């Protein structure tokens, strides 16, 4: 073998000048970048330090809790609380905390059982299924007393084993008088609201506050609180004492006699303030969806959810503002006032009633087939003579009659501050033919609501001023300071004081010697008018009877309107139940309001009502014979006809309908 030669040595790479320069440049670049960052940080610290500090702190938020506002109260005119929000608590579970130590679970469950109506298995399930949760709302609207009892147990727990339970402050809406004025006050719950609660929701509603917590730069816990803005208080015109009187008498009537529905409205004619209002079923505002007071369990079991909702809507519906019927004879004073204003009649005008009037070839009878004979203007209202009213309507003609109907807000909303007010139906001027005018003159062929009739009569007896009916008396802050005072709103001057005086005196005679003697209250001068309406279908012989009265006659301070829908008697048409119920209510309301007593035997200006005329048979004229009425379009309310004076022979009364003749459409 040959010999190996000597091994070759590896050449060492030299760190050349070029590489040294590159390394130096890289180092300098890094230094420059680092210096630039330092300069930038210094700049930001001085120029935008506060802004960035706040941004960082905002990202370190510890907690954020809503602070519930308190909804404003609803009071009666004297400060009696009808609706308020009370302080309650929501029970919050913190499963993460409860599970953090084994010894926490059982003592905590035991304390919950002692103080609250809890389902232990349900709580265990929540803790197991949400082990990392720190916020589970378990119960709502817990009274403060129960919370205080639980907190006392926590305080007495020396081992500190009751953990993971805390309470969130909240408010609960309560109605101290339960069903009192339920149609007016209304309720707010589960996304539904009615009455004042609905109409003045914006004023009653406040704004939630919020509590924030975070750690500052030194890790100190900081709290920022934005206080809640509470809602305003609504002071209503309702008088709780008068409301109680009304509801007591209606309840007694329903127990003794009964009806499909009984409604009463009490208002001050001088400013149109509503003092009391009731209609339909009375329900507990604290539990408005409870149907058990109205239906048996078997009935409820058979009802679908849709049927239950329909039943609730019927119960919640306010008949006074949302339902309509033919006003009948309660409208007659409006026709008389219109003709007086136009100078077509006077208190000395006389009329002859032969028991029937031929209108465009059709015979329309008066209630008294034999006729009333010659009667004065006052006696047309005293004895509710349809023939005389048709004569007056004929003198008026269509245009003035329609103008006065609209002046008294028939066919329009009155503007009362309650939701779901209806307009009713009246004939348009171009549809007021001779027959339509004749029947409308005595209150038949068109629909109106209780609030429309009461507001119109108030204007007739207060000197002629039509005020907007209202329920708001005052708006207050949550501290009780007055924000707004609701003064009487004059809509228009409907008739003159002279006309008002004549009508008042005629209505006084109606109570003293006419069709409304059952409404008399000893010691008080009362004016008023009866009404009877026949409902559809006619063959069922179902009627709605009514009476509207005011006192004292010289200077009316209160109007009371009573409607009894289908009284539980055989002869509904000739019943005087509305007048009698008025009498019972007025007998208590007048003394309560300090209405001055005046002996009715004293001389009183009766607008020439004492003139010597052929006097009808009072017994016959105190009956009211209903006639055919109207067929409503799209109404939920039962439709009714009129009353005491239009028996017909082979004649169908014209009606104002939605499709062609109604001046307004129900909404």
Predicted feature descriptions by range:
Residues 1-298, 324, 399-407, 519-521, ...:
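Periplasmic/cell-envelope proteins involved in peptidoglycan metabolism and beta-lactam response
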């Amino acid at each position: 073998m040959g010999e190996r030669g000597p091994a070759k040595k590896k050449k060492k790479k030299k760190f050349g000048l070029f590489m040294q320069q590159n390394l130096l440049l890289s180092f300098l670049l890094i230094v420059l970048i680092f210096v630039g960052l330092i300069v930038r940080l210094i700049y930001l610290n001085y120029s935008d330090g506060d802004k960035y500090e706040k941004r960082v702190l905002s990202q370190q938020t510890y907690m954020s809790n809503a602070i519930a506002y308190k909804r404003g109260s609803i009071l009666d005119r004297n400060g009696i609380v009808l609706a308020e929000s009370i302080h309650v608590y929501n029970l919050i579970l913190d499963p993460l905390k409860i599970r953090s130590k084994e010894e926490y679970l059982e003592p905590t469950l035991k304390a919950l059982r002692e103080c609250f109506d809890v389902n232990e298995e349900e709580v265990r399930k929540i803790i197991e299924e949400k082990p990392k949760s720190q916020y589970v709302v378990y119960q709502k609207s817990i009274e403060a007393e129960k919370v205080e009892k639980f907190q006392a147990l926590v305080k007495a727990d020396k081992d500190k084993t009751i953990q993971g339970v805390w309470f969130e402050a909240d408010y609960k809406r309560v109605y101290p008088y339960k069903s009192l004025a339920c149609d007016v006050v209304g309720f707010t719950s589960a996304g539904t609201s009615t009455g004042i609660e609905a109409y003045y929701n914006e004023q009653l509603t406040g704004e939630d506050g919020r509590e924030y917590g975070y750690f500052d730069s030194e890790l100190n816990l900081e709290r920022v609180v934005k206080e809640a803005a509470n809602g305003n208080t609504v002071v209503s015109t309702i008088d709780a004492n008068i409301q109680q009187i009304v509801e007591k008498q209606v309840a007694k009537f329903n127990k003794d006699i009964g009806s499909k529905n009984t409604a009463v409205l009490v208002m001050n004619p001088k400013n149109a303030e509503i003092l009391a209002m009731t209609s339909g079923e009375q329900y507990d505002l604290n539990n408005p969806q409870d149907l058990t007071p109205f239906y048996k369990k078997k009935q409820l079991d058979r009802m679908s959810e849709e049927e239950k909702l329909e039943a609730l809507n019927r119960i919640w519906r306010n008949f006074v503002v949302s339902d309509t019927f033919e006003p009948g004879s309660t409208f007659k004073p409006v026709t008389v006032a219109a003709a007086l204003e136009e100078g077509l009649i006077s208190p000395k005008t006389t009329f002859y009633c032969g028991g029937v009037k031929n209108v465009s070839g059709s015979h329309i009878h008066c209630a008294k087939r034999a006729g009333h004979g010659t009667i004065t203007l006052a006696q047309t209202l005293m004895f509710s003579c349809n023939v005389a009213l048709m004569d007056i309507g004929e003198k008026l003609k269509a245009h003035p009659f329609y103008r006065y109907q609209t002046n008294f807000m028939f066919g329009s909303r009155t503007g009362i501050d309650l939701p779901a007010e209806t307009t009713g139906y009246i004939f348009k001027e171009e549809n007021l033919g001779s027959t339509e005018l004749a029947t409308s003159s005595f209150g038949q062929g068109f629909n109106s609501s209780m609030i429309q009739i009461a507001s119109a009569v108030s204007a007739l007896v207060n000197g002629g001023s039509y005020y907007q009916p209202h329920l708001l008396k005052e708006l207050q802050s949550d501290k009780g300071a007055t924000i707004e005072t609701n003064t009487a709103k004059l809509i228009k001057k409907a008739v003159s004081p002279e006309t008002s005086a004549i009508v008042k005196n005629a209505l006084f005679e109606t109570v003293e010697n006419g069709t409304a003697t059952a409404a008399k209250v000893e010691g008080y001068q009362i004016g008023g008018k009866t009404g009877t309406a026949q409902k559809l279908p006619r063959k069922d012989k179902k009627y709605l009877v009514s009476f509207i009265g005011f006192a004292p006659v010289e200077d009316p301070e209160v109007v009371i309107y009573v409607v009894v829908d289908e009284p539980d008697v055989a002869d509904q048409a000739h019943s005087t139940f509305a007048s009698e119920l008025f009498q019972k209510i007025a007998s208590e309301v007048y003394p309560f309001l300090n209405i001055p007593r005046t002996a009715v035997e004293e001389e009183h200006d009766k607008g020439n009502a004492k003139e010597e005329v052929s006097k009808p048979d009072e017994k016959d004229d105190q009956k009211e014979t209903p006639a055919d009425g109207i067929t409503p379009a799209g109404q939920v309310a039962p439709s009714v006809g009129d009353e005491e004076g239009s028996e017909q022979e082979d004649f169908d009364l014209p009606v104002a309908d939605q499709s062609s003749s109604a001046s307004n459409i129900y909404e």
